[in-house]
Curated annotation (Swiss-Prot):
It is an enzyme of class 5 (isomerase). GO terms for molecular function: glutamate racemase activity. Pathway: Cell wall biogenesis; peptidoglycan biosynthesis. The keyword Isomerase applies. Its EC number is 5.1.1.3. It comes from Marinomonas sp. (strain MWYL1). This is Glutamate racemase. It catalyses: L-glutamate = D-glutamate.
Amino acid sequence: MKVGVMDSGAGGLTILNAIHQKHPYLDLVYLADDAFAPYGSKSITQLQDRLVKVGRFFENEKVCAIVVACNTATVAAIDALRASTSLPIIGVEPAVKPAFRLSKKRRVAVLATPVTAESPRLNQLIDLWKEDSHVSIMSSLTLAFDIDAWPETEEKVKQTIEQLSQEMLAQNIDTLVLACTHYPLVKHLFEQILGDECEIIEPSEGVTAQLIRRLTESYPNDMSQLLDAVSTRQDSSQNQGSIELCSSLGFKNMQRLNSWVVSSSAIKGCRHVLI
């Protein structure tokens, strides 16, 4: 079975890596929509129109489901995508529920792009789960874009993370929600400054579980046959699905995309696509 995974750049590879690690038998087509990046600076209407076009691309790829591995695209445009296709659509929402449950000091920070930080959906989730917790919603206009340009922008990324982390330390934050899929790519930089006492939450496991639930609901016979075949194969290499990397910008960023994929041996191709 083939699944489409998309983001504005490299961030969604945190989700792709989690899916491939947990369910390596799935074929994955990844779209980095670099030509339209950064999503965080676009209007709601622009993002809705773009996501509908992305949906058409994945329909032509004959995928069984689409994972919108981008918080900004999820909060701004996932409803428009769902209205345009019959494929199962899985989004990424800020993992605020587990954050409030884990926070011992009841002091939580949510770090997002401006579009996500200002979205009604994020505020709804916070109001639903925060109870008596202090919540600091923080945003960066440049961090996701700079992560896409890594390693040339490494020092700029480190400076931004240093500034954000110092603000969190000043507020005595003990739980951080990374509400942009780019940010877990540099999670170790947050950990170096915030230390072991700050729990850092990201959504990849939850999104992976939701994908499998939706595939099982939508394609019960296909999933049953696939899992039966996987369980009976003695050679685990036969269960290895493929990863195909696509970019709307061209081959300029392919080396960067490749560098963030954990199972590089599963990459079977790279393509420039027009959206």
